[in-house]
């Protein structure tokens, strides 16, 4: 990848000495969807696919950025003394937001740089290409200027940038999984306390297969922020009878006993999903430790149905992919992953059935929707970092 990045960099900015190389992964969430901003648990892992960068220092205050994934957009430029969100900068607002966040927290960025990005995360697939770019930019600034900033602070800064600079009310899961990822491990993360534990995925004989619906979706334009508000409204109702700070504080049995406090029926269903999905995420992490694969498959099924019926963030394309997967003999479990409204599914498939799964599920999906799905056999990798000798 280094040689490829060098070539792109030279063609865009000319050849420069002292190039440094960085990588930030994408992420996939095995279970625990739309729980992160509800103070619940998630169970994500970092992928080996992600975003790469080649960086050269400048001796002025100019930052020049180019993405090989958005070639037609050309070079995006900004000055370090005037970092602002500009709609026409599109993808470049994500790294700009992280630069701005460093500056706002008193971490000086003394000079600019030229940077080339190149990613192999499908854009809009729900595998967190945006958070990948944010953490990548964070690691660049950390490595060049502020080694005292630890990984957890980088994660928080990237999330804050997306919330306040980009204007997407995301939880912390994406940035956390990408910043703190560990090879061959998922992490059970409490999104309220940020307590976490790594869980080695004993998936011998099994493969994680990501399927991209290729249904166009953009998170900021979807109903994401609406769902967040509905959950907040439900929480306010529940607080009238329960001493809780977040939906993630409630056990399913307590929710069932007090759900009538929630006046609005739609909000009640949203909250039910958040409470039960939090329980499913915790249980799934335990099931991986016990190697209880069949129970994991059942929990994934329950998760998808809850996202479909109670949270209403699936779509016909996601449902078709998941239903086709459930009908395949080699599948342990399958569900939508990510924010929904399009994007990807994650399936646990027996190794010997992977090729047949991709063929048959892909054919059935195309027949039902007219769209061709893309499939990726996922490898679980390390978090965002500078590539030194890799």
UniProtKB/Swiss-Prot annotation:
ATP binds at residues 67, 124-130. Mg(2+) binds at residues 130, 162. It is found in: Cytoplasm. PROSITE patterns: GALACTOKINASE (PS00106), GHMP_KINASES_ATP (PS00627). GO terms for molecular function: ATP binding; galactokinase activity; magnesium ion binding. Keywords: ATP-binding, Carbohydrate metabolism, Cytoplasm, Galactose metabolism, Kinase, Magnesium, Metal-binding, Nucleotide-binding, Transferase. The active site is at 174 (proton acceptor). The record marks 27 as: Transition state stabilizer. GO terms for cellular component: cytosol. Signal peptide: none annotated. GO terms for biological process: galactose metabolic process. Pathway: Carbohydrate metabolism; galactose metabolism. It catalyses: alpha-D-galactose + ATP = alpha-D-galactose 1-phosphate + ADP + H(+). Pfam families: GalKase_gal_bdg, GHMP_kinases_C, GHMP_kinases_N. Gene3D superfamilies: 3.30.230.10, GHMP kinase, C-terminal domain. It is an enzyme of class 2 (transferase). Its EC number is 2.7.1.6. InterPro entries: Galactokinase (IPR000705), Galactokinase_bac (IPR022963), Galactokinase_CS (IPR019741), GalKase_N (IPR019539), GHMP_kinase_C_dom (IPR013750), GHMP_kinase_C_sf (IPR036554), GHMP_kinase_N_dom (IPR006204), GHMP_knse_ATP-bd_CS (IPR006203). Substrate binds at residues 33-36, 224. SUPFAM superfamilies: GHMP Kinase, C-terminal domain, Ribosomal protein S5 domain 2-like. Belongs to the GHMP kinase family. GalK subfamily. Catalyzes the transfer of the gamma-phosphate of ATP to D-galactose to form alpha-D-galactose-1-phosphate (Gal-1-P). NCBIfam families: gal_kin, PRK05322.1. This is Galactokinase. It comes from Bacillus subtilis (strain 168). The lineage of its organism: Bacteria, Bacillati, Bacillota, Bacilli, Bacillales.
């Amino acid at each position: 990848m280094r040689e490829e990045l060098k070539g792109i960099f030279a063609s865009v900015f000319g050849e420069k000495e002292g190039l440094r190389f960085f990588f930030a992964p994408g992420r996939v969430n095995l279970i625990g969807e739309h729980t992160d901003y509800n103070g619940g648990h998630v169970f994500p892992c970092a992928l080996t696919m992600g975003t790469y960068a080649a960086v050269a220092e400048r001796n002025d205050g100019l930052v020049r950025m180019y993405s090989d994934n958005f070639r037609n957009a050309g070079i995006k430029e900004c000055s370090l003394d005037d970092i602002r969100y500009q709609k026409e900068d599109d993808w470049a607002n994500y790294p700009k937001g992280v630069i701005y966040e460093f500056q706002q927290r008193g971490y000086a960025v003394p000079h600019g740089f030229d940077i080339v990005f190149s990613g192999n995360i499908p854009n809009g697939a729900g595998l967190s290409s945006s958070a990948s770019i944010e953490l990548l930019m964070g690691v660049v600034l950390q490595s060049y200027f502020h080694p005292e900033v630890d990984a957890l602070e980088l994660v928080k800064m990237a999330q804050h940038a997306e919330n306040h600079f980009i204007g997407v009310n995301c939880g912390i899961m994406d940035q956390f999984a990408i910043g703190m990822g560990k090879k061959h491990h998922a992490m059970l993360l409490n999104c309220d306390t940020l307590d976490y534990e790594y869980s080695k995925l004993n998936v011998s004989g099994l493969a994680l297969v990501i399927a991209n619906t290729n249904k166009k979706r953009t998170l900021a334009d979807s109903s994401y922020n609406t769902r967040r508000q509905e959950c907040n409204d439900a929480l306010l109702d529940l607080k009238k009878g329960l001493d809780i700070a977040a939906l993630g504080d409630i056990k399913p049995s307590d929710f069932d006993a007090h759900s009538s406090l929630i006046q609005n029926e739609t909000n009640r269903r949203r909250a039910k999903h958040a409470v039960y999905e939090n329980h499913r995420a915790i249980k799934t992490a335990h099931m991986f430790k016990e190697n209880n694969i069949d129970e994991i498959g059942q929990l994934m099924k329950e998760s998808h149905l809850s996202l479909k019926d109670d949270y209403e963030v699936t779509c016909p394309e996601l449902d078709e992919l998941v239903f086709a997967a459930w009908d395949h003999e080699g599948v342990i479990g399958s569900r939508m992953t990510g924010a929904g409204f399009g994007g990807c599914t994650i399936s646990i498939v027996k190794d010997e059935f992977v090729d047949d799964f991709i063929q048959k599920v892909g054919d059935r999906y195309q027949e039902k929707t007219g769209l061709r799905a893309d499939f990726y056999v996922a490898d679980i990798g390390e978090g965002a970092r500078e590539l030194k000798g890799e």
